[in-house]
Every structure is written in structure tokens, then in C-alpha cells.
Amino acid sequence: MSNLCVLFFQFFFLAQFFAEASPLTFELNKGRKECLYTLTPEIDCTISYYFAVQQGESNDFDVNYEIFAPDDKNKPIIERSGERQGEWSFIGQHKGEYAICFYGGKAHDKIVDLDFKYNCERQDDIRNERRKARKAQRNLRDSKTDPLQDSVENSIDTIERQLHVLERNIQYYKSRNTRNHHTVCSTEHRIVMFSIYGILLIIGMSCAQIAILEFIFRESRKHNV
């Protein structure tokens, strides 16, 4: 019974973790700039973002992006060009609205996954709050009086960090797999079109040869007559 409870709590924790970490998917239309925003309630919050271009026509996955701080909406604090995927964290020195803007060029539409969020709590405070929540859910006593429980809590914190790394790796491989699949489909389409053009060219050349031969034989008969 205790093993079933442990498995239940692990499953609940994993489901909650991945539900909170799900990114936003949006369409980046050609020739247009798309901006998304996050509002920080105080200064010195850790702002993090992760994005990956999932689809792009003609193998065009490159986008330009800028990040603007609340104090200056005209001058970006971060600016990158020709990126397919990006991830970074920085300290927001100002309270207010931060914006991340994408531009995919004038040639093709693109599909982008984005995770743009902030965290104003220190990691130690976050771990303590999570531990308190777990204790409240399971009616556990203080871990300071139980070395085994303290060891279990430390193991859970380690699992949380490893899950965060795993989530990022999954997003990276998902993006790479999507781009590779799109590249394969695009290459397959080009091969099919090239084959069709080749067949039509052969048929056209055969018809032209037949017409030329008929014209030559017709002219030779006229001369013989």
C-alpha cells in the first residue's frame, strides 16, 4: 500500500511539473513581428525564455528576436539574428512588463514554441515551500528530527533539478526531430517534383523527335516525287 502511495505522489508530481512547464505555440507570419509579454511584480526577478522554431517553409527556420525591458521600449536589452532555437536567463533589474519580439522575415511563415516566464523567489525559498507543501499533503513531521526523511527530501530536490534538465533536453530533441521531419518531407516533395519534371521532359523530347522524324520523312517523299 505504501508503495502505491509513493508511486501516486511521484506520478502526481511529474504531471504537475510538466503541466506547468508546457510552452506556448504560435504562428509567426511572414513580414510581421510578433511580441509576447510577461509582467514582473518586483525587481531582481529571474526572467528565462526558451524558444524553438518547429516548422518553416523551404527549410527556412531562422528568426530574429529582441527582448525589451520596462524602462526602454525602443532599445532592446537582448538582440539576436538568424536563430533557430534559443535559451537564456537573466536578472530583471526593473519592475514591469518585459517583451520578447520575433521576426521571421518576409519569405515564409513559421511555427514557434516559446516558454517565457519569470521567478522572483530564490531557489532555497522555492525548495522550502515545496517541502512544506509536500509535508502538508502527507501529514509528515519535521525532517530535521528525522534524518531519513531529510535524505528523501534532498533526493526529491535532486529529482526536480534533473527533471528540469530532462524537460529542456526533450524540448531540444523535439524541435530537432520536427525540423528534420520537415526537411525530409520537403526533400521528398522536391524529389517527386523533379521526377515528374524529368518524365515530362522525356515525353516532350520523344514527341519532338517523332515530329522531327515525320517532318524529315515527309520532306524526303516530296523531293522523291
UniProtKB/Swiss-Prot annotation:
| PROSITE patterns cross-referenced by the UniProt entry | GOLD
On the Lumenal side, which residues? 24-195
Example of a GO biological process term: Golgi organization
Report the superkingdom from the record.
Eukaryota
The name under which this protein is listed is: Protein ERP3
Listed transmembrane segments:
196-216
Q: Which family does it belong to?
A: Belongs to the EMP24/GP25L family.
What is this protein's function per UniProt?
Answer: Involved in vesicular protein trafficking.
GOLD domain spans which residues? 33-172
Q: Which Pfam families match?
A: EMP24_GP25L
Which keywords does this Swiss-Prot/TrEMBL entry list? Endoplasmic reticulum, ER-Golgi transport, Membrane, Protein transport, Signal, Transmembrane, Transmembrane helix, Transport
